[in-house]
Structure formats: structure tokens, C-alpha cells
Amino acid sequence: SSKGLFSKVIHQSGGSSLTNRSVREAHLALGHVFAQQTVGDDVDDPIRAMRQLPADTILEAADTVFKNHYFDAVVDGHSVRESIMDTLRDGKIHAVDLLIGSNDDEWLMYTGDQPDIEGWLDAEVARSSVDTLHAILADEIDDRRKLDLLRTAKYYVCPSLVLAQEVSNVGRRAWVYHFTRQREGDLAATMGAYHGAELPYVFDTHDDWLPTVEADHRLTKVMQSYWVNFATNGNPNQSGLQPWLPFKSDSRKIQSIGDRLYSSEHPSQPLCAFLSPT
């Protein structure tokens, strides 16, 4: 059990862990194929045999067998006994304070120039919800951005809000952020507030592949103050900082962190009525 091992949680762009779709049987089948390709079928202990192989052999086979496969936690009945959503439904999460959030464009840089919105909706959303989702996004004319909003909401925003609500329900404080800062320049414009964009601000590790201007340094100081305050006290607020309201079931306030700092409902909240994990 992990109970008592931590007193607070900072969870950045991690909402997808609530909705992982890894199936044990599928992993076992891939493992069998992997063993066949590396050591064959006529081996009593394939794992031991694979451990004797050169690393290059293992990597070459993995590139073939696990191509396009997404690794995630698998409910195996031993180390992982149930899905996170089952834990939430049963009210068994640890009562600790939570700081959680995601970025405005988590999926934009991974979206091609001809996004298949209808294909994604067919695969990911109940048919009865499709027309309403189209209506919610009717004002968005850029199809790449539209698919980015849908993916970011389903895989990051909506699960994060579900977890924040459950933390609030068990009597602890949840603080939700929405990171919106886009760097200056043409390259940054193609990515927006991309997956991982908040990390240089949290750790003050700005690299030179994107421009860093005075506004970025100011935001770094603000975010580091929020994060350190939370790690210390379970509350990101302090005198002199823009107030950050806790997330609650009745108010659902999040903190927008970017060129402006302010509290509001998450702009993707309407999408979450149809895209939240259940």
C-alpha cells in the first residue's frame, strides 16, 4: 500500500493515467510474439534466455513488435490491483492535497495538417454526443486546433477535473491550473502551450531552442512560488501573488497561468460533460 508514503501530490499533464486502456491479455500476447522473435518457441525459460541476448538485439525486436504500442500501467492483480477509476468510484483514494493541471495545447504539435476529426470522434466518443461536441466547437475554424482541444480535454483536462473533484469530496484541497503561455516566434506558434511547456517555468530550465523573454522570467518566478508554497503548505497562495482559488464541486474554479493570471471555470468544461472518464 502507498498509504502514508506521501502527504501531497503535484500531477502535471497526467490526467490520462485515469483513462489508460492497457489490457493485460494484450500485453501478454505481445510478450509472446516478442519472445518468438528473439529466442524462438523451443525454450523452457524465454525470459532467462532473453536476458542473455545483446541489448541491440532486444531493441531491434522491440522496435518491430511494440511499434505504435503505448505502454501504461496494467491491472495484473498483484502490483496493480484495480484501475484508478475503480479506486475513485469506491472512494479509496488517499486524503491528501493535490495540485494538478494541463496545458492549453497538449496535442497540437502531434496533430498533422489534415486532422481526421470525424475518425477520432467515431473511435473515442458516443455517437449521441458527436453533434453536441461539434456545436461546442463551432466557433473554432482551425481543424488542427479543434482536434487538439478534443484530445487535450479527453486525455488531460477532464480526467484531471475528475480527480480534483474526488480529492475535494474526501475533504482535502485541490488546486487546478490551466497553463496557456505560448513562447514568442513562428516556431512557438505552431506548438502553442505544448505538452511539457510548463516544465522550464517550474524548474527555471529554459533552453535556447525557443526564445525566453522577460515575460517568461517573470512567469517562472510566479510559478515557482506557487509550486514551492504548495509543496511546503499544501496551498500555493501567498501575499503578493494573484490569488488561486481551490477547486470545489460547486464552484469548479481553476487558475489560468500564462500572460494573465486569473481564476475561472476551465474553458474546456463544456467538453468534459461528454468526455470525462466514467
Predicted regions mapped to residue ranges:
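Substrate-access "cap/lid" subdomains that shape
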Residues: 3, 8, 12-121, 146-169
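Mobile gating loops/cap/lid regions near enzyme active sites that modulate substrate access
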Residues: 158-278
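Short acidic (Asp/Glu) and glycine-rich catalytic loops that position anionic groups and cofactors
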Residues: 8-11, 31, 41-42, 139-143, ...
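Alpha-helix N-cap/helix-start motif at coil-to-helix transitions, marked by capping-box chemistry
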Residues: 25, 124-127, 131, 193, ...
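Short coil/turn segments at secondary-structure junctions
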Residues: 18, 142-148, 210-214
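Alpha/beta-hydrolase fold catalytic core
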Residues: 127-170, 175-181
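Structural motif
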Residues: 1, 88-91, 194, 218
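C-terminal, loop-rich substrate-recognition/catalytic regions characterized by aromatic stacking residues
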Residues: 93-137, 183, 224, 256-278
